[in-house]
Amino acid sequence: MARIAGVNIPTNKRVIIALTYIHGIGSFKAKQIADKLGIDHSRRVQDLSDAEILQIREAIDAEHTVEGDLRREVAMNIKRLMDLACYRGLRHRKGLPVRGQRTHTNARTRKGKAKPIAGKKK
């Protein structure tokens, strides 16, 4: 098991797929990293040398915000919006959709399970 950015990445998968197990690295960034370091996309993690794994680790640490730092940054951005009491911050605070989606029906993912209203029959 190779450990990159505090995450154990699977050894039997291709490098591009394995890097996406790190929060903050999707397929596009994984391909960018592999291209920059000259690693073939079809190679598997178990076939990489320790030096190549170290190169990947250093490239991610130097250029990308990942894992805990990224989660903290996103949480701080949301907290800043809530402290400003702007429209987006109020929507976050109330647990409603932030980007203009309708809420009369739908929005169940954001609002949670439907709460029954006493006395209301169909």
Curated annotation (Swiss-Prot):
InterPro entries: Rbsml_uS13_C, Ribosomal_uS13, Ribosomal_uS13-like_H2TH, Ribosomal_uS13_bac-type, Ribosomal_uS13_CS. GO terms for biological process: translation. GO terms for cellular component: cytosol; small ribosomal subunit. Keywords: Ribonucleoprotein, Ribosomal protein, RNA-binding, rRNA-binding, tRNA-binding. Residues 95-122 are annotated as: Disordered. The keyword tRNA-binding applies. It holds the Pfam family Ribosomal_S13. It comes from the Bacteria. Gene3D superfamilies: 1.10.8.50, 30s ribosomal protein s13, domain 2 (4.10.910.10). GO terms for molecular function: rRNA binding; structural constituent of ribosome; tRNA binding. Located at the top of the head of the 30S subunit, it contacts several helices of the 16S rRNA. In the 70S ribosome it contacts the 23S rRNA (bridge B1a) and protein L5 of the 50S subunit (bridge B1b), connecting the 2 subunits; these bridges are implicated in subunit movement. Contacts the tRNAs in the A and P-sites. Belongs to the universal ribosomal protein uS13 family. Part of the 30S ribosomal subunit. Forms a loose heterodimer with protein S19. Forms two bridges to the 50S subunit in the 70S ribosome. This is Small ribosomal subunit protein uS13.
